[in-house]
């Protein structure tokens, strides 16, 4: 799809502000190459879409790629102020690697010298340096704030106790503390405390702006 190149991002001015080592403002974003991968449930041959044609008809659109690159590309190509509701469930930065089991025909053995059996694949690692995670989250939230409709847009951000206190301050900075609506507390599957001196983790939070 034909794409524009670059656009400037307005500085966020909400307060309070959270500071970390290496914090950088998101000043410009650029467009990344994209292509049609597949279309479903159509009666005619798919036409190669353009961003211009998608502006008024982009429901049921699944975008594959790094979220910052996808959001940047959409913004540069005219999707500012277009979205009414955003829900994100970002990594909680727990330091864990999440794997899936892949059953291989004919064997259940492990490869010699490997800690993980070869029928397990890492789906993603939930591990960032602290400053990298905070910068990643701020960049994503700034991009989303530019996509949300300024009059009717809402965003819901799900996070757990590991970083909820940091994310709340970043949300105040990006969306303004005055636009905070509520914190929704939701139950989660019970997680053993692992120590008599610790409490079980039973809830997560959704911040609504």
Label every PLM stretch briefly:
Residues 189, 196-208:
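Polar, glycine-rich mid-to-C-terminal structural blocks
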Residues 81-97, 104-105, 147, 154, ...:
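Hydrophobic or amphipathic alpha-helical targeting/insertion segments
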């Amino acid at each position: 799809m034909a794409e524009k190149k670059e656009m400037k991002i307005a500085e966020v001015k909400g307060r309070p502000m959270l500071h970390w080592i290496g914090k950088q403002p998101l000043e410009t974003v650029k467009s990344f190459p994209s292509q049609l991968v597949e279309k479903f449930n159509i009666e005619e041959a798919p036409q190669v879409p353009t961003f211009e044609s998608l502006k008024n008809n982009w429901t049921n659109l699944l975008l594959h790629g790094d979220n910052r690159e996808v959001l940047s590309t959409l913004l540069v190509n005219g999707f500012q102020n277009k979205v009414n509701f955003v829900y994100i469930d970002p990594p909680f930065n727990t330091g864990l690697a999440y794997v899936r089991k892949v059953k291989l025909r004919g064997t259940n053995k492990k490869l010699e010298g490997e800690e993980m059996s070869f029928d397990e694949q890492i789906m993603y690692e939930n591990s960032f340096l602290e400053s990298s995670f905070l910068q990643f989250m701020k960049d994503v939230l700034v991009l989303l704030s530019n996509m949300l409709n300024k009059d009717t847009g809402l965003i819901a951000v799900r996070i757990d106790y590991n970083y909820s206190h940091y994310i709340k301050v970043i949300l105040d900075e990006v969306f303004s503390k005055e636009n905070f609506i509520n914190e929704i507390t939701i139950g989660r599957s019970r997680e053993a405390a692992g120590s008599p001196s610790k409490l079980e983790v039973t809830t997560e939070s959704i911040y609504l702006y």
